[in-house]
Amino acid sequence: MAIEKKFITDGVRNVRVEKFLTKELKRAGYGGMDIARTPLGTQVTIFAEKPGIVIGKGGKQVRQLTQDLATDYDIESPQVEVQQVQNPNFNAQIMAERLANALERGWYFRKAGSSTIRRIMESGALGCEVIVAGKLTGSRSRTQKFTEGYIKHCGEPSETIVEKGYALAIKKLGTIGVQVKIVPPDARLPDAFDVLEPEPKKAPAEPIEPEEVGDDVFEEEFEETSEEEYVEEV
């Protein structure tokens, strides 16, 4: 298989796996996944707000997920690992699912979007953006954007420091798409710099001034030295 075709195949497979896990682990607070190739097989790391639901009673759920990944998605020797999300407010996928659930429960989109932005920024994030698109209030589709703080939209920083999440809210009027972007507090911004404090300079040593000694002192020292040498010789 050509290397270009392999990249495309792996990308399509990852999208299918992401969609499958999002649907199966919705109650567990699914927060994303990572697939890495290892000498023993394929390491699949699942991030969830409630890892106990992902594992299931006696590990039943995680064994079923492992079997589905191997049979339905052609993942070679999958090894599923579940990690708990430390701070869900910094996970874009979890916050997008929460916002979609709020819209499905009947929250007004402005209130839901503003509440999500406020919760993320109060947790210490450097920036956040929420985009809600669909039939929000009437028969026509529209897009509403909420932004606060620092957000990068292009270039390498938009791929490395911006967390992205997407979810769908199914309502009577139609489907509403929700997109959340978060810049976590530990992100290294491209224009950030550190100011180093100058080291304290040591005070220069004071010059030692030679003491003025008279001829009498030299004569006394010479006489004492001569007497000591004379005693030693005797």
From Swiss-Prot:
The keyword Protein biosynthesis does not apply. PANTHER family: 30S/40S RIBOSOMAL PROTEIN S3, SMALL RIBOSOMAL SUBUNIT PROTEIN US3. Part of the 30S ribosomal subunit. One of its GO terms (cellular component) is cytosolic small ribosomal subunit. Coiled coil: none annotated. Residues 17-86 form the KH type-2 domain. One of its GO terms (molecular function) is structural constituent of ribosome. InterPro entries: KH_dom, KH_dom-like_a/b, KH_dom_type_2, KH_sf_prok-type, Ribosomal_S3_C_sf, Ribosomal_uS3_arc, Ribosomal_uS3_C, Ribosomal_uS3_euk/arc. This is Small ribosomal subunit protein uS3. The keyword RNA-binding applies. HAMAP family: Ribosomal_uS3_A. Binds the lower part of the 30S subunit head. GO terms for biological process: translation. Belongs to the universal ribosomal protein uS3 family. It comes from Methanoculleus marisnigri (strain ATCC 35101 / DSM 1498 / JR1). Keywords: Ribonucleoprotein, Ribosomal protein, RNA-binding, rRNA-binding.
